[in-house]
Amino acid sequence: MQSDVSIVACGSYDPAECRRAMEQVLAPLGGLDWVSPGMRIVIKVNLVSAMKPEEAATTHPELLCALIELLKARGASVVLGDSPGGLYNAAHLTHVYDAAGMRQCEAAGAALNMDFSQKTVENPNAAVARRFTYTAYLDSADAIIDFCKLKSHGMMGMTNAVKNFFGVIPGTMKPEYHYQYPKAEDFAGMLVDLAEYFAPRLCICDAVVGMEGNGPTQGTPRKIGALAASASAHKLDLACAAMLGMTAGDVPTLRAAVQRGLCPEKVEDLRITGDLSAFLVPDFQAPKAQGTVFFGQDGRLLGRLGNTAMRAFLTPKPLPQKKTCIGCAKC
């Protein structure tokens, strides 16, 4: 029976160590036997900001290179992509790619996404995000690999495989989505909808050095020493949350996934290959997940005024169509 989650030790970002760990973590999941020559694989990385690899905010290039080499050996073409906050254009992404060490991945044979087209879709099967706009380069993929970074997160408690899909929303649109889904539960539901819509074929977590404290960008690097993988973003998140001393109840995206039957509530119910207990970080400094994303939660006047103004500006509102409106007032 195939494992739900595979976890192996990876003590550093040494190239040989990364290659060994990558091969070892994928084996219990069937390896990369599903990859065939000519496939176009998009690796959805975490490039949250223009930060250096040693700052532990982004997926490390050495691990990416190990995966790229394995995929190229099977005849696949590989594209790396993400949409960090800010302008979704060549100038900004080039800056992020350079800072995060992605040129190393380019040298290993991967293309760095430079397609900045966008697409808006209806998603009738969603629980929350029934309509959203995303980065259309993903449409070219025969399969998506979600390669996330394990970090603390001020709103979601933890950012990992599911939260990584917020990177499909074009950068300048992200504040709009925060205001469209101001409550943590709604925002988490939106993230789960995105993860289900894009249905990654494989999810891998860089937990060699994670981030604790004021994540996802202003925290402190924390060595965990693990590489983890799963076919399920939700099950991977459940196992990784346990590493940080969290349960499904502590992470809004996991609560949403459990409610939808996408993963068990308890990590003990996962089929795990590897010793999860070897990677527990009992003193991990995690921020308390916030109930909303709005600023001014401490009640200060300027915060409340700014909050009110931004809510009025960004919150979606119905726009009646005079020719078809029947005056039912449901909107």
Identify the meaning behind each predicted range.
Residues 1-326:
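N-terminal and secondary-structure boundary signal
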Residues 329:
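Cys/His-coordinated zinc-binding microdomains
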